Amino acid sequence: AEVYFYPENTTEFELVDEIEHLVEFYDGVMVQLPLPPHIRVEAAIAAIPKEKDVDGFRRDSCFDPATPLGIVNYLDYCGFEWTGKEVTIIGRSDIVGKPLARLMTNKDATVTLCHSKSKLSNHIYDSDLIVCAVGQAGFLNCYPIHCPVVDVGINFVDGKLVGDCYNTDGRNVTPVPGGVGLLTRLTLLENVVKAKEMYG
């Protein structure tokens, strides 16, 4: 594996050109987000061929997005019984929320995808599982939660990395750091191996 760093003033054209060059030499390529505001994420991702998009960001990617797939695989490993379970996903991004809802629906869970206008307390109370991917430190702390929580949040408070649900003693919450981020990296590696086997 190789990591390439580029100056923040790299233009969109230069980055896309570099990606199109690098994909010739690797089985899998990913772009670390966020990008500087002058570079469109869509343009950078589109430069990666679908069979090498191991992060699963393209709509036509040959791979499921790494973070959602890592979460589902982890819950499978833990023995989570999907059929008929009420799952609330808070955050409807194209990278986590929406693809995760699709994967969990395919497992026969009943999924509610919430956003900033949702009345969360109604959904949270009835949930068998909550996934929070808001990106707001302590977002869930004010809600009475009686089920497991998968915390996808990445936030910094006083220089420390924390999730969307932290300082919650006694709650069944995946840790940040050391939780979903590790699952994402593991799934990325699995996708790279698959890319090599299928297309290498």
Can you annotate each of these PLM segments?
Residues 10, 14, 39, 66-70, ...:
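Conserved active-site and cofactor/substrate-binding residues in soluble primary-metabolism enzymes
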Residues 41-55, 147-199:
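Rossmann-fold NAD(P)-binding glycine/threonine-rich loop
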Residues 4, 57, 114, 176:
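Hydrophobic residues at beta-strand termini and immediately following loops
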